[in-house]
Amino acid sequence: MHYFFIIVIWLLSINTAWADCWLQAEKMFNIESELLYAIAQQESAMKPGAIGHNRDGSTDLGLMQINSFHMKRLKKMGISEKQLLQDPCISVIVGASILSDMMKIYGYSWEAVGAYNAGTSPKRSDIRKRYAKKIWENYRKLKGMSAEEKNKRLSIAANK
């Protein structure tokens, strides 16, 4: 599985203007592209080069605000901080991978969505719920759009 993931990341990195990265992430991880987009809206306001500094000293990088906690594993796969900041498709794929990991723990649920941001500690349950509620609002708005408007947004975000 790791080799497949590395190959996909490599393919995405050579074609950063690829507008279908949201749909590719959806297919790879069986997570709706609209849900991933809703997370990116909340995490970075759709800014691929976004950098967030956290109180615990960690840093969040890129469109999907990938926490520096994951960098040791990502570096072993050949993914750098620079790539997360400069290639939105890599950020989307990595974000989908992290959300998929949370879904292995919590199932396809809003608890898993909350864990994407707040982690799995039982002490952070309320934070997970608040975060999931924000994502739900973004997701609900996106699901209410016409297919044409939705495709336009997904395409624009992939090419930023």
Swiss-Prot record:
The name this protein goes by in its record: Invasion protein IagB
One protein family per Pfam: SLT
Family (UniProt): Belongs to the IagB/IpgF/P19 family.
Encoding gene (name): iagB
Organism annotation: Salmonella typhimurium (strain LT2 / SGSC1412 / ATCC 700720)
Domain of life: Bacteria
InterPro entries with a match to the protein in the record: Lysozyme-like_dom_sf, Transglycosylase_SLT_dom_1
Keywords: Signal, Virulence
Signal sequence range: 1-19
Parts of the chain that traverse the membrane: none
